[in-house]
Amino acid sequence: MDQLKRSLLEAPIIEKNGYHYFVHPISDGVPKLDPGLLREIVIRIIRKAKLEDVDRIVTPAAMGIHISTAVSLMTDIPLTVIRKREYGLDDEVAISQQTGYSENEMYINDVREGEKVLVLDDVLSTGGTLAAVLDALDEIGAEVIDTVAVIKKVGGENKAADAGHDVKTLINVDVVDGEVVIVDEDGDS
């Protein structure tokens, strides 16, 4: 059994405002992130994502950063982090992020019209974060070459899909009776 699948099956489940989610090193930073798990994920992303002609990797803070940094190191593709803090730079674009359990403002800086980007994130659950990011990149005029989320939690709405965005995933899971259930161990192509 691969490390990603095993780690998800062992993940504790918590409830926050009626929303059940798993606590996992990739999505939450706890428990500790084993380097072998991160390596496995990075290799799978590199194999699954379209990387040809990508100018930059774009990821939302915070839990996409470690994944995207590792992919950047392996591919030599520069990385831009979408921050939760406003800097007031000339090219800054504000976006509203709505997830199953929170609502925040995020800010994209240093992404230009015509740039070809790979969007990476840790989890696709409601699709709120990725839908907002992908819509903002479209408004900027960046060309999204590919979008990959490590884990997809199925069973609810998917704002990214509803907005016409295709997102590849490495593994798809659901939470049933307080446990993670693997729905598709290969994710979405």
UniProtKB/Swiss-Prot annotation:
Keywords: Purine salvage, Transferase
GO molecular function, one term: transferase activity
Highest taxon, organism lineage: Archaea
Protein EC: 2.4.2.-
Any one GO biological process: purine ribonucleoside salvage
Pfam families linked: Pribosyltran (PF00156)
TM region(s), chain numbering: none
Alphabetical list of SUPFAM superfamilies matching this protein: PRTase-like
Function according to Swiss-Prot or TrEMBL: May catalyze a purine salvage reaction, the substrate is unknown.
Family (UniProt): Belongs to the purine/pyrimidine phosphoribosyltransferase family. Archaeal HPRT subfamily.
NCBIfam families on file: HPT_Archaea (NF040646), PRK02304.1-4 (NF002635)
Designated name of the protein: HGPRTase-like protein 1
Organism: Haloterrigena turkmenica (strain ATCC 51198 / DSM 5511 / JCM 9101 / NCIMB 13204 / VKM B-1734 / 4k)
Origin organism lineage: Archaea, Methanobacteriati, Methanobacteriota, Stenosarchaea group, Halobacteria
